[in-house]
């Protein structure tokens, strides 16, 4: 597609699909279909960087991190809300309004869950998102535009065309429960900071100078109001009507919102939302009631800090004390060892809790939690029970300090602590039951052993039946055995066995990669193979030699040493060799160190006439080059084919050497 109007239509279509998915929760195409369209968009923009629209989905994430945050004064102050913690306080609120509006017989309120997030002001000018600001002190906030743009529920351009020249939308940025769990799981795996709750995680994400970090954390947004509007814009009669208008322009509102009447309506709505609180996919900490009539809002006005026409009815806190009976450990699918508190069962927020996370050893030491303590337990996020800390005044004399086990409770392999990280990890990657399925999925993957016909579901079935525990077990399967599986005909079974046997002929680099050594990716595996040229040499390599290799730092070197030191892993490797696993002799994998591309970082862009990009990648890697997908100051060469786009532009701006296809081929060493 080379038509600019068609490109514009594609941008419009992708934005509409994002709206259907993130705002309406009603997608009309599948995720893979969206991905196809998005990749198509990226290809067009790579070829035609001058076509790129500011509202394109590709423009949500910036290239360069900010150096610092800048303050912004709000055009209209961002007020807080008064809180009500008891029913009597809600009654007093309603009574004050009724006294100030004696002519109003029945007052309608908009009621909505109070999101446990961060208030944000998003400014649109001529329909385009131009700035996003935190509440700050209500008068001055911080510019966080770069971290709001990656939120897919926030449109970069408003829908329709009937919006005012200036419109400021106000709402809450939050992190869903599922996104929060995924983030903490990732933080646990890498030994990073564990967040106490989704609100803290969302706040930490907005405080990132690099938008790429915030983008990975999957923040969400619900609007709750507006700030500055163009003078010529006529507000509707009701608050709910203005919210509906903002939704029509592409912004998401909380679907749980309702219009209620009087004190009975307030109580009924509170009870209804509190009852479904744990089922909601996000955190809430109360209910917000707002007078629905905008003219009556204006008549009541504001105090120094809050509107007189709105109030937040807060939910009660959910923390209790109980006894910490023991601390045990669980082994995650990546081998991370996580301490878990075993508690005297206690009701927290209506749920019986007997286990709670302690995150990692550093957290246990920081909180000084000991076995036998009386501890505070919180249902962090209403879902994940967490030990907040001990009640020191209740500490008995016979408490025990917890020590991380030296051997994995699942497989007996050594447990090691990663350098400069909080995480402890089991080294039995090939044999540990807790890591088994993940290790086997990786072993058969396309860039590893590339075993045709062995999909994840079939592997899970083989593991569940006890037929496959370790990678070498694949090579003892038979057609007759596989054919007994449900939905597995003899021909299909034969195809699987053929694929397994074909994988016995591989390369040293693929074999190393297939082992699933932590932090050892495809490039590192190739560097190891090219440097040592022999499996035994890699297995016997010392830490000091490993860290001299390209792409191998101290952490990776430690993982490699620990992996090959573990006898269980050695047993599986020997089993694979006994099954007939082999690769070409070292001479055929030697890298020409005299090649101009040896140990160089190379980027391919545009269309090549002599071969495809994957074919070019193979040729360059054979010369010792490292192929990357983006241009940076560390790039040595950019090889530019026809219709090279933004990568070529960036290379020229950074002063990176650019080669045409002909120039590159001329530099390649001639084959004997």
UniProtKB/Swiss-Prot annotation:
Instruction: Tell me the InterPro entries matching this sequence.
Output: BRCT_dom, BRCT_dom_sf, DisA/LigA_HHH, DNA_ligase, DNA_ligase_AS, DNA_ligase_CS, DNAligase_adenylation, DNAligase_N
Query: Which residue positions are annotated as catalytic?
Result: 114
Q: What are the annotated GO cellular component locations?
A: cytosol
| Catalytic activities | NAD(+) + (deoxyribonucleotide)n-3'-hydroxyl + 5'-phospho-(deoxyribonucleotide)m = (deoxyribonucleotide)n+m + AMP + beta-nicotinamide D-nucleotide
For this protein, the Enzyme Commission number is 6.5.1.2
Q: Which Pfam families match?
A: BRCT (PF00533), DNA_ligase_aden (PF01653), DNA_ligase_OB (PF03120), DNA_ligase_ZBD (PF03119), HHH_2 (PF12826), HHH_5 (PF14520), Nlig-Ia (PF22745)
Q: Which cofactor does it need?
A: Mg(2+); Mn(2+)
Name of the top EC class for this enzyme:
ligase
GO annotation terms (biological process)? DNA repair; DNA replication
Which positions are annotated as binding Zn(2+)? Answer: 408, 411, 426, 432
Could you give a GO molecular-function term held by this entry? DNA binding
The text of the family note is: Belongs to the NAD-dependent DNA ligase family. LigA subfamily.
Function recorded in the entry: DNA ligase that catalyzes the formation of phosphodiester linkages between 5'-phosphoryl and 3'-hydroxyl groups in double-stranded DNA using NAD as a coenzyme and as the energy source for the reaction. It is essential for DNA replication and repair of damaged DNA.
Alphabetical list of HAMAP family matching this protein: DNA_ligase_A
Protein name according to UniProt: DNA ligase
Which gene is this protein's source? ligA
